[in-house]
From Swiss-Prot:
Pfam families to which the protein is assigned, alphabetical: Ribosomal_L22 (PF00237)
GO CC terms: cytosolic large ribosomal subunit
Family the UniProt entry places it in: Belongs to the universal ribosomal protein uL22 family.
Name of the protein in its database record: Large ribosomal subunit protein uL22
Role played: This protein binds specifically to 23S rRNA; its binding is stimulated by other ribosomal proteins, e.g. L4, L17, and L20. It is important during the early stages of 50S assembly. It makes multiple contacts with different domains of the 23S rRNA in the assembled 50S subunit and ribosome.
One GO MF term: structural constituent of ribosome
Subunit description: Part of the 50S ribosomal subunit.
Length: 94
């Protein structure tokens, strides 16, 4: 039987990847109810963003793939580095 995977992607989130990885490592491998409870009570800046992303992935699984919500778990979650803003410090360079 083929396993079905639902995914969600958050782009252009202005949180440091190192800080977001601390939160993501807490929910890897957990079922959805546990992951949502962990993210709700985690006092980190990245927690609400990752909770919103998790809820989006759950909605994709339930609505698009017709999967049972109670059987869902976090199979894979990762954080990569996004774009950087180019800054300039105006100063004489000669």
């Amino acid at each position: 039987m083929e396993t079905k995977n639902a995914k969600a992607i958050a782009r252009k989130v202005s949180i440091a990847p190192r800080k977001a990885r601390l939160v993501v490592d807490l929910i890897r491998g957990k079922n959805i109810a546990q992951a949502q409870a962990i993210l709700t009570f985690t006092p980190k800046v990245a927690a609400p963003v990752i909770l919103k992303l998790l809820n989006s992935a759950v909605s994709n699984a339930v609505n698009n793939l017709k999967l049972n919500r109670e059987q869902l778990y976090v199979k894979e979650v990762f954080v990569n580095e996004g774009f950087r803003l180019k800054r300039m410090f105006p100063r004489a360079k000669g």
